Amino acid sequence: MNDLRMYNVLVRPLVTEKSTMQLEKGNQISFAVATWANKPQIKKAIETIYSVKVEAVQVSNAKGKTKRFGKLEGKRKDWKRAVVRLQEGQSIDLFDQGA
């Protein structure tokens, strides 16, 4: 997988109450990833971009919600969530506090 495609695998980090607790207790970080990405691609992208060792990757597909736009009914995009467990002693600083 080339470098440009690796950056397309990770869409954004997910910051929720649940993901914050997972980060504090279990050294796990949640990401929204591309729907076409599989576990080995996600693992390789995170290890390359953030220079950390990944212990495990869990993925789940989330269906897009049905929403109304006035009279029209539309649907949000389906997306994929990845929960990445890092090895002991590894960490990712997603938000640079020094700026």
Swiss-Prot record:
Keywords in alphabetical order: Ribonucleoprotein, Ribosomal protein, RNA-binding, rRNA-binding
Alphabetical list of Gene3D superfamilies matching this protein: 3.30.70.330
GO biological process: translation
Gene Ontology molecular function, alphabetical: rRNA binding; structural constituent of ribosome
Keyword Coiled coil in record: no
GO cellular component, one term: ribonucleoprotein complex
Quaternary structure note: Part of the 50S ribosomal subunit. Contacts protein L29, and trigger factor when it is bound to the ribosome.
Xref: NCBIfam families: PRK05738.1-3, PRK05738.2-4
Role: One of the early assembly proteins it binds 23S rRNA. One of the proteins that surrounds the polypeptide exit tunnel on the outside of the ribosome. Forms the main docking site for trigger factor binding to the ribosome.
Family to which the UniProt record says this protein belongs: Belongs to the universal ribosomal protein uL23 family.
Protein name: Large ribosomal subunit protein uL23
Organism: Magnetococcus marinus (strain ATCC BAA-1437 / JCM 17883 / MC-1)
